[in-house]
Amino acid sequence: MTSKSSPLIFERSREGRYAYSLPKSDIKTNSVESLLDDKFIRKNKAEFPEVAELDLVRHYTELSNKNFGVDNGFYPLGSCTMKYNPKINEKVARIPGFSESHPLQDEDQVQGSLEIIYSLQEELKEITGMDEVTLQPAAGAHGEWTALMIFKAYHENNGEGHRDEVIVPDSAHGTNPASASFAGFKSVTVKSNERGEVDIDDLKRVVNENTAAIMLTNPNTLGIFEKNIMEIREIVHNAGGLLYYDGANLNAIMDKVRPGDMGFDAVHLNLHKTFTGPHGGGGPGSGPVGVVKELASYLPKPMVIKDGDKFKYDNDIKNSIGRVKPFYGNFGIYLRAYTYIRTMGATGLKEVSEAAVLNANYIKARLSKHFEIPYKQYCKHEFVLSGVRQKEFGVRTLDMAKRLLDFGVHPPTIYFPLNVEEGMMIEPTETESKETLDYFIDTLISIAEEAKNDPDKVLEAPHTTVIDRLDEATAARKPILKFENLKQEK
């Protein structure tokens, strides 16, 4: 690995330097020892970096210039919906009445915030076809886990606590089996058929009296719509199981079809994906969960309800699984999502899905002569191609992804889902222009040509980034996670 990276903030530290100072307080202070038990007090001084304010500003400005995001360039990361985040969302989120409020304020003082929460719940109920929605979960996987805990409580309350199996397709997001495990279930895999859809015969084989639920994304992770969803619903419901909808791919079907109309009993959404909350830097996210009326009494508490002309928290939820997030989730993301929904309207959301599907199919059609396309039918918002042709020249999908960096494009998701050899999952979203799509397509075609005629150029990529190829094996086996470890290495 060759590095042209910046020094760490700790490496810029010089003893005695500081960014600013505070005037001496004229208020009597107490020692830490008088306030905390000895077991909570550090024995050694914390090694905070000591830098001047200018050095601090330059350090983080330099790092920010090396970041890549949707505002920098094309970001076709499959199943992540890296769409443009409208700046009006940020303006609304910074309105002082919202941004300066506190979650412990009296309900009477935050009626506007509670109205936003209530109104967003109502909008999401309409979009998903669910009867009730909680906004508490802080991310997609958190929403998955919350829904599964609701399922678990429901089965136990109905004398069927023996139901401990959750069916997960082989093309599912990795968080699905992980969430099932965290919720105390066993994962059972159902195979895909030759069209990339759930194999109905295999589903009939794995469903049994212990089936608690099936977790599905529709369209699925291959970008293919599960056209047999009503038959899947019948099979699982007849066995006493429930249907869970992973909302990761909702961007493909808004105002076209609703999870509730497909027979799902619970759904999670990603406000940070479909509804333009900024993401890609680790958060904050938001993963609301919607349920049918039979499961409403199990939702996390409190819920925000409307009582006459006022909005308030409701803790009187009979079978509630309890609180799943401090206060009431990530409110700033609610503001952005609500702004987006109200700005777009139902017609706008429908056009979003139509454009997302059109863009994905356009890229797929143009690349089909240059890459292997495992599933030939029309896709929805994303699709998976395979790099098996390029592998014949010693170039793998990973190498092509690295080469894309040299052209200012963030690589698509690679080697996922696991059932496609040398897979590359591409999701362009609706917000990209035809010019951007053509640039990406032409770039991938040129990389495919390089793989054939000049493979070393691809194998040695990237050539223009701050950091060249990482030694991924060493990074995985001997990670340096603390500055203290870095000092020891040196």
From Swiss-Prot:
The modification N6-(pyridoxal phosphate)lysine is found at K273. It holds the Pfam family Aminotran_5. The keyword Oxidoreductase applies. The keyword Repeat does not apply. GO terms for molecular function: glycine binding; glycine dehydrogenase (decarboxylating) activity; pyridoxal phosphate binding. Its cofactor is pyridoxal 5'-phosphate. Its EC number is 1.4.4.2. The glycine cleavage system catalyzes the degradation of glycine. The P protein binds the alpha-amino group of glycine through its pyridoxal phosphate cofactor; CO(2) is released and the remaining methylamine moiety is then transferred to the lipoamide cofactor of the H protein. The glycine cleavage system is composed of four proteins: P, T, L and H. In this organism, the P 'protein' is a heterodimer of two subunits. Belongs to the GcvP family. C-terminal subunit subfamily. This is Probable glycine dehydrogenase (decarboxylating) subunit 2. It comes from Staphylococcus aureus (strain NCTC 8325 / PS 47). The gene is gcvPB.
